[in-house]
């Protein structure tokens, strides 16, 4: 079990009052203006409306203040979503890219748009391809196969393009690392324009233009664009129009790519995604319309969360399980009947992806049960035969969530060649860890939080040992990243209207997460199964007010709390419209016994380190070393009540927060003696 600490953000009360007043005044003035009354409001009416708006906007102002946004002007600009999109020409080499593309159009050359097999790559390809078509260009598009070609521009792809007589390649969402491939293209007489958003290597590829906001010498102000975002800027530059005008034509594709690639939803991305989601709701693209219909979102407001959990996985599934061309065909499809067929096919592929992912996840869990010593590894390296390489990265992510440590999942083919995909946790550089074992690998790549590798089967045991040796030296105690809580709440002060006001903070995503609230000293009043028992719906009561909240992935029989327990809950809040009217709803992220602070997660990390043989300071040892009487107390508690072995938080709470580490060590000792 991973014990996670919570971090409640500090709150400047004076700044909160000032910001609440500013937001309330703005809202009141808008209400007065929209009322279009014949006479200006009286002072009494204005004051009454202002007081109501102060109450309704207090929750919104609290979240903004907790996130450090205390300047009223900055806050009101953010809430209005009015951040301007910067001039595309500020991107270094954008002028060179446009000049070469214009010349190709004028001279009737065939332009090849070369993309990638993920959502960002597919949407970027469709976006640029369709825009060039609209400009009258002769254009083709090409996507690599995940298994056959691998990521990015390859020599085989360049040779194929050359053999078809094409002389200009424009990459989207890839190419920044294609140094050798760029040289090869030049040898064949092919001009190359690179548009990408990934971190460049020390030496840039030699190309006609290299457009990447993350170039060291790039002069554009915003560095958080995804591949589709860069392609969007290229289209605006080619048209010579403000990027805001381009939003009406391809903002939907740019928004899907941005959200799916987990780019920060701040700055220009916030403006782009906000506009793109509105366009997506009323899209005139038959392919996207069919996909929305397939996932039950037709005619409904589309959120960034809908893109992340419903739209993006289906587009991604094609590249993972089959061929990304299927997804590209859907996005660009203009025939509604054909679009419906393709959307249904993608849905079936995604279902297969989910089934395959679950099979591998269960196999990995069985491996851990058969070899429990792997649970002591700082970096978990798990391997199996013929696991589908398209989903091992997703499985690694799920295992990271479950174990709280870096995980690499490896599939072995019939030739003994292995491909691995790893995911990390904050504070642990997985790329550096893997790089320290480079002599055992065929190749590797990635970054601190995610990496991939290729290795021979016979080197896997040595790789596991070396990964953990490096981790023991460089990161002996791995603390779980705390769950950031924005604001403590009291249910009797939270209304449907105040929660609706939070919609102004959307779209939510990377660097702009859904607000997390801390509900303290709530009584667990009810537990109900959801989705055939896969999830739990809890009724939490605080004073005379209560809220129903769903805990996804927590079956009722595994819930480590009983009716009547007093708990603290970290949760999101939303509003749903029921036959009985609008009601508050919650989504539980974590649950602690009431009053249990950060000591549980902190001392649990020391216990894990002790079990792994990591040297601890005398002070750390003292914190977690139980006396004989402590072990006796724990034994009696275990005999008196059936505590869940997967979650001992309630037991730790009962025996005292300051004794958390001692309790966990005592449980471990009792497990070892049976």
In which residue ranges do the predicted regions lie?
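Conserved acidic residues
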Residues: 167, 208, 568
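Histidine/acidic-residue-rich, glycine-tolerant segments that coordinate divalent metal ions
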Residues: 172-225
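Acidic, two-metal ion nucleic-acid-processing modules in DNA metabolism proteins
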Residues: 133, 138, 270-313, 317-365, ...
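Hydrophobic helix-and-loop "lid/oligomerization" segment in the mid-to-C-terminal part
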Residues: 3, 10-13, 17, 41-42, ...
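Short alpha-helices
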Residues: 127, 206-259
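Short amphipathic alpha-helical segments and helix-helix/interface helices
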Residues: 158, 182-183, 667
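Terminal, basic amphipathic appendages of nucleotide-handling enzymes
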Residues: 1-48, 66, 70-80, 84-85, ...
């Amino acid at each position: 079990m991973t014990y996670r600490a919570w971090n409640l953000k500090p709150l400047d009360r004076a700044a909160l009052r000032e910001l609440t007043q500013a937001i309330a005044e703005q809202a009141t003035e808008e209400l007065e203006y929209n009322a279009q009354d014949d006479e200006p409001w009286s002072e009494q009416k204005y004051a009454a409306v202002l007081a109501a708006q102060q109450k309704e906007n207090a929750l919104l102002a609290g979240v903004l203040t907790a996130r450090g946004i205390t300047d009223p002007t900055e806050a009101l600009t953010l809430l209005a979503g009015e951040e301007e999109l910067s001039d595309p020409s500020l991107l270094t080499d954008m002028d060179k890219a446009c000049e070469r593309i214009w010349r190709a159009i004028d001279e009737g050359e065939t332009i090849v748009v070369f993309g990638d097999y993920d959502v960002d790559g597919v949407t970027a390809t469709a976006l640029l391809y369709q825009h060039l078509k609209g400009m009258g260009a002769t254009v083709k598009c090409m996507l690599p196969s995940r298994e056959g070609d691998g990521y990015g521009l390859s020599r085989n792809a360049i040779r194929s393009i050359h053999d078809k007589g094409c002389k200009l390649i424009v990459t989207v969402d890839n190419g920044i690392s294609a140094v050798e491939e760029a040289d090869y293209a030049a040898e064949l007489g092919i001009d190359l324009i690179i548009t990408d958003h990934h971190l460049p290597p020390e030496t840039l590829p030699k190309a006609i233009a290299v457009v990447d906001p993350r170039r060291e010498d790039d002069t554009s102000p915003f560095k958080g664009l995804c591949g589709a975002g860069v392609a969007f800027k290229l289209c605006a530059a080619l048209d010579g129009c403000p990027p805001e005008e381009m939003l009406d034509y391809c903002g939907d594709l740019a928004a899907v790519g941005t959200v799916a690639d987990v780019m920060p939803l701040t700055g220009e991305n916030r403006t782009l995604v906000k506009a793109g989601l509105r366009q997506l709701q009323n899209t005139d693209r038959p392919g996207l319309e069919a996909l929305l219909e397939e996932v039950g979102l037709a005619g409904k407001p589309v959120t960034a969360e809908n893109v992340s959990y419903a739209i993006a996985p289906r587009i991604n599934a094609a590249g993972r399980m089959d061929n990304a061309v299927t997804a590209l065909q859907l996005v660009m499809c203009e025939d509604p009947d054909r679009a419906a067929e393709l959307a249904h096919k993608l849905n079936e592929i995604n279902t297969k992806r989910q089934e395959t992912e679950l099979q591998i996840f269960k196999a990995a869990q069985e491996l851990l049960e058969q070899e429990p010593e792997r649970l002591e590894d700082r970096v978990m390296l798990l391997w199996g035969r013929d696991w589908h390489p398209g989903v091992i990265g997703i499985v690694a992510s799920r295992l990271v969530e479950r174990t709280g440590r870096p995980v690499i999942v490896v599939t072995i083919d019939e030739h003994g060649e292995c491909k691995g995909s790893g995911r990390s946790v904050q504070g642990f550089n997985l790329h550096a860890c893997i790089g320290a074992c480079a002599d055992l690998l065929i190749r590797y790549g990635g970054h601190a939080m995610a990496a991939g590798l290729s290795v021979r089967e016979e080197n896997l045991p040595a790789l596991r040992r070396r990964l953990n040796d490096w981790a023991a030296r460089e990161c002996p105690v791995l603390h779980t990243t705390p769950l950031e809580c924005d604001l403590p709440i009291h249910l009797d002060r939270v209304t449907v209207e105040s929660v609706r006001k939070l919609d102004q903070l959307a779209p939510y995503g990377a660097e702009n997460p859904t607000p997390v609230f801390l509900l303290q000293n709530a009584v667990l009043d009810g537990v109900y199964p959801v989705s055939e028992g896969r999830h739990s719906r809890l009724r939490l009561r605080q004073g005379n007010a209560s809220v129903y909240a769903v805990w996804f992935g927590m079956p009722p029989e595994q819930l480590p709390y009983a009716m009547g327990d007093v708990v603290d809950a970290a949760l999101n809040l939303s509003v749903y419209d029921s036959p009985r009217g609008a009601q508050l709803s919650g989504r539980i992220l974590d649950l602690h016994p009431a009053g249990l602070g950060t000591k549980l997660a902190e001392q649990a990390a020391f216990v894990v380190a002790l079990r792994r043989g990591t040297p601890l300071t005398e002070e750390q040892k003292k914190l977690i070393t139980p006396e004989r009487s402590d072990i006796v107390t724990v034994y009696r508690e275990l005999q008196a009540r059936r505590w869940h072995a997967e979650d001992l938080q309630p037991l730790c709470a009962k025996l005292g927060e300051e004794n958390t580490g001692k309790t966990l060590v005592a449980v471990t000792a009792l497990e070892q003696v049976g």
